[in-house]
């Protein structure tokens, strides 16, 4: 008889999330519409030459690559090796040198106080255990170092889109907190707790000019975004449910699309480790 342990359950959940993020082409989405967030976080975190940087849940490198361009020493980590491979290819094309390591944001394979700056943009927010992930950000940052995070807000387009598809996603159990809670000031302040000081937050809008119609937004997410692909795969041949999710996503996109422009709200957070 096999007895499941918390560690085994964590490994199973990590494997499920790794497979989900490998669906579609999240790297394409990140590079086409989310790339402007990279320089924003790099500047806010004060990254520059010689700074030891850890990028957590780095994806295909939207933050890691701009950080490396400043002359910083960057280690780029992610749970999904396919995304790290994409980042490596981009780095080679740009003549940049980074270190890469597959890692779970909830159990980073690094020593305490190892980095000057620890960053994550639209990444750590998707770790299932928010508190464990926040604790890890703080743990691996040196005292006096900087923690910087960008997350989608609950109230913005992306947060509402995630809420819309959540009931259809088998990998998201009812007891898991919504990812976009990282976009609420009070919530993320509570996660970081007494481990940081000088915490600052600011809401911003990512301007997206990729789509002409709400249907185009729907199609883009349905074809490229892992969580959406997972939702439709779970629906399967149920035409009624598929049509209902189609309707919800198109109507949501229409609320945020005006003259070919969307604005996706995010929360930028910076703090100093005590």
UniProtKB/Swiss-Prot annotation:
It holds the Pfam family Methyltransf_11. The keyword Acetylation does not apply. The keyword DNA repair does not apply. GO terms for molecular function: methyltransferase activity; S-adenosylmethionine-dependent methyltransferase activity. InterPro entries: Methyltransf_11, SAM-dependent_MTases_sf. Keywords: Signal. CDD domains: AdoMet_MTases (cd02440). Residues 1-30 form the signal peptide. To M.tuberculosis Rv1403c. This is Uncharacterized protein Rv1405c. It comes from Mycobacterium tuberculosis (strain ATCC 25618 / H37Rv).
């Amino acid at each position: 008889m096999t007895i499941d342990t918390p560690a085994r359950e964590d490994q199973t959940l990590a494997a499920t999330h790794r497979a989900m993020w490998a669906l579609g082409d999240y790297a394409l989405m990140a590079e086409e519409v989310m790339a402007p967030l990279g320089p924003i976080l790099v500047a806010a975190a004060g990254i520059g030459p010689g700074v030891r940087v850890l990028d957590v849940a780095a994806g295909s490198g939207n933050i890691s690559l701009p950080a490396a361009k400043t002359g910083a020493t960057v280690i780029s980590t992610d749970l999904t090796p396919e995304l790290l491979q994409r980042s490596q290819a981009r780095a080679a094309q740009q003549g940049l040198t980074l270190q890469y390591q597959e890692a779970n944001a909830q159990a980073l394979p690094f020593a305490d106080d190892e980095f000057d700056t620890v960053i994550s943009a639209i990444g750590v927010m998707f770790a299932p255990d928010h508190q464990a992930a926040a604790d890890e950000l703080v743990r691996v940052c040196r005292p006096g170092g900087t923690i910087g995070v960008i997350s989608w807000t609950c109230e913005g387009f992306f947060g509402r889109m995630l809420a819309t598809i959540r009931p259809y996603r088998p990998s998201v159990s009812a007891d898991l907190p919504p990812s976009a809670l990282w976009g609420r000031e009070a919530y993320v302040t509570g996660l970081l707790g007494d481990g940081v000081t000088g915490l600052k937050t600011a809401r911003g809008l990512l301007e997206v000019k990729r789509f002409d119609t709400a249907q185009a937004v729907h199609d883009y997410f349905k074809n490229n975004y892992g969580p959406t692909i997972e939702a439709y795969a779970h629906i399967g041949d149920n035409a009624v449910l598929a049509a209902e999710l189609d309707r919800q996503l198109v109507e949501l996109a229409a609320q945020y699309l005006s003259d070919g422009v969307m604005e996706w709200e995010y929360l930028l957070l910076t703090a100093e480790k005590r």
